[in-house]
C-alpha cells in the first residue's frame, strides 16, 4: 500500500473525535498570522496526493483509489516491473543504507531510482518495483516528482488483503485509468 505522508497526517487528525475542531483551530491560527494562498494551504493539514495504491503481486495488478470533485474512484492497472538499467558504479547513502542507482523510462518520463541491496524487497513507492532491493529514492529527470523514504520500521500488523478491501471499495465508482486521468487533468 502506498499513500502520501500528508494523507496519513490528515486522516489521523480526522480520526480523532474532535479532529474537525482541531483542523479548524489550525486554520484559524494560520489566518490570524495573515497567511494567504499557498502559505495558508501549507500551514494546515491537507492531502497533497489523493491516490492510494494497493499492489497485488499474486494477481499481478495494482488497484488505485483516488478522489476527484467529491467522488471516490477506483481503477485497476497492470503491475509491471519497469525495465531498469542498473548502474553498478553509482552509489549513494539513503537513510543509512548504501544504495545503487538504476534508471528507466516509465509512462513518458525518465526516472532515476536508488535501491538498497541490503533490504531485499523488490518494491518502492507508487507503481515502481522490480529492482533487487527496496527503492529508497526515485525521481523523474526534472524532479517534478520526487519520492524519498524518510523512515522504516518493522511492524507486526495484520497484512493488507484484498478480501478485506473489497467491502471498503463499495462506495468507489469503478473507472478505467485513461478515463480517470482525462477527467483529472481536464
Regions found by a protein language model. Give the residues of each.
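Extracellular or lumenal secretory-pathway regions
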Residues: 1-83, 89-91, 98, 143-186
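Short helix-to-loop capping/linker segments positioned immediately adjacent to catalytic or ligand/cofactor-binding
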Residues: 87-94, 123-125
Amino acid at each position: 500500500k502506498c499513500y502520501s505522508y500528508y494523507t496519513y497526517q490528515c486522516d489521523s487528525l480526522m480520526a480523532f473525535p474532535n479532529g474537525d475542531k482541531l483542523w479548524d483551530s489550525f486554520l484559524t491560527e494560520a489566518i490570524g498570522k495573515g497567511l494567504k494562498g499557498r502559505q495558508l494551504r501549507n500551514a494546515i493539514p491537507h492531502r497533497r496526493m489523493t491516490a492510494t495504491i494497493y499492489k497485488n503481486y499474486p494477481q499481478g495488478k495494482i488497484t488505485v483509489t483516488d478522489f476527484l470533485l467529491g467522488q471516490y474512484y477506483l481503477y485497476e492497472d497492470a503491475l509491471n516491473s519497469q525495465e531498469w538499467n542498473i548502474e553498478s558504479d553509482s552509489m549513494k547513502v539513503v537513510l543509512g543504507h548504501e544504495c545503487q542507482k538504476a534508471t528507466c523510462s516509465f509512462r513518458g518520463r525518465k526516472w532515476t531510482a536508488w535501491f538498497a541491496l541490503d533490504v531485499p524487497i523488490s518494491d518502492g513507492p507508487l507503481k515502481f518495483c522490480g529492482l533487487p532491493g527496496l527503492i529508497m529514492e526515485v525521481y523523474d529527470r526534472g524532479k517534478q516528482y520526487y519520492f524519498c523514504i524518510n523512515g522504516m520500521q518493522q511492524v507486526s500488523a495484520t497484512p493488507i488483503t484484498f478480501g478485506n478491501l473489497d467491502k471498503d471499495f463499495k462506495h468507489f465508482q469503478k473507472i478505467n485509468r485513461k478515463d480517470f486521468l482525462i477527467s483529472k487533468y481536464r
